[in-house]
Amino acid sequence: MAVLGSPLLPLRLFLCFGLLFFSASCTDHPDQCMIFNKVTSIHNSRIQVNPKVYESNTVYTVSVPVNNTISSVVMKAVDMHHSVIGFWQKADMNCTSSALYHVKSPHEHVLEAKWLSPASTNINTVELQVFVVDFHKEATASVLKLEKSGTSPALITKLITTKSNTVTTTKPTVITTHTTHKNSANRVFRSPVRDAIQILLAFLTSKLLF
């Protein structure tokens, strides 16, 4: 029996390691556009958006002042429930909840990004979060609020918090967010498949071990 059981040992170990690797690989990945070494909230009244009131299914132009110390600008739009909404057009990198635009030239003074608001008419307030990132991966964050009423957008200083409620840190900071309905649906779809594979691996492992 020992002779017959010994060839099965590598297979048992392989299945055990496979189960652990699969479980680790199924965890959610952070938003790659939102990993910074430092985040500071500021009041930047020079950031402009046009049009100045919120309407559904409308293209907005966000103008962000930049200089030769800025490497990129990360844009993010959320509704009053902090769910990511809309679509950032022609971004250099689209991430889980945000979009990244590279500063193409050191002589560039204004970076423009276009955002398409969702078709839903149930949204009254939108926050456009702007992260201006330098070459040290340190970001300054500003929030521009668009309202459906006839009021002008109010650029406000708002603390962009992480899981540990830390704004400024020496370690890489990952900005967390709620996902869209599409991302939620993908996770709901993947969850039964992931559970089924884990159960199958556990079943095969138990059969080989016992």
UniProtKB/Swiss-Prot annotation:
Q: Which domain of life is it from?
A: Eukaryota
The name this protein goes by in its record: Placenta-expressed transcript 1 protein
Membrane topology according to the record: Single-pass type I membrane protein
Leader peptide range in chain numbering: 1-26
CC per GO annotation: apical plasma membrane; external side of plasma membrane
User: According to the UniProt topology, which residue ranges lie Extracellular?
Assistant: 27-189
Q: Name one Pfam family in it.
A: Reeler
InterPro entries per the record?
PLET1 (IPR026184), Reeler_dom (IPR002861)
Q: Which UniProt keywords apply?
A: Cell membrane, Differentiation, Glycoprotein, Membrane, Signal, Transmembrane, Transmembrane helix
Kindly list every residue the record annotates as glycosylated. 67, 94
Regions that span the bilayer: 190-209
UniProt GO BP: cell differentiation; negative regulation of cell-matrix adhesion; positive regulation of cell migration; wound healing, spreading of epidermal cells
The stretches that face the Cytoplasmic side, renumbered to this chain, are 210
Function of the protein: Modulates leading keratinocyte migration and cellular adhesion to matrix proteins during a wound-healing response and promotes wound repair. May play a role during trichilemmal differentiation of the hair follicle.
| Entry's localization field | Membrane; Apical cell membrane
Tissue-wise, where is it found?
Answer: Highly expressed in placenta.
